Amino acid sequence: MFNLGNLGEMMKMMKSMQENIEKAKEELRKEEIVVEVGGGMVKVILNGLGEIKDVLIDKTLLTEDNHEILQDLLVAAFNEANRRTKEVMGEKMTQAAGLPSNIPGLGNLF
């Protein structure tokens, strides 16, 4: 039969988990991730939620001759920033939800 006492405990656990996740989001918002490509010629700075804060480009890339190189470096930087953000966010949210971190692919859910 259905036990209402267990339901109450589950609701408390869910509320606690939700509070932990909100706290983790605030921590991620404050966290800074720096991605450098091209030997530091392009740098992307973002927070743990993936919000881009700054893009720094070496002035030597800002010429017509370097147009394609700059495009390639920007693509590489944004792809790496995306990968790193997912990694950091997955770890933080898995921890906040109280889930084991050794389950493959679990971090990709967040």
Swiss-Prot record:
GO terms for cellular component: bacterial nucleoid; cytosol. It is found in: Cytoplasm, Nucleoid. It comes from the Bacteria. Keywords: Cytoplasm, DNA-binding. The keyword Cytoplasm applies. Homodimer. PANTHER family: NUCLEOID-ASSOCIATED PROTEIN YBAB. This is Nucleoid-associated protein PERMA_0533. It comes from Persephonella marina (strain DSM 14350 / EX-H1).
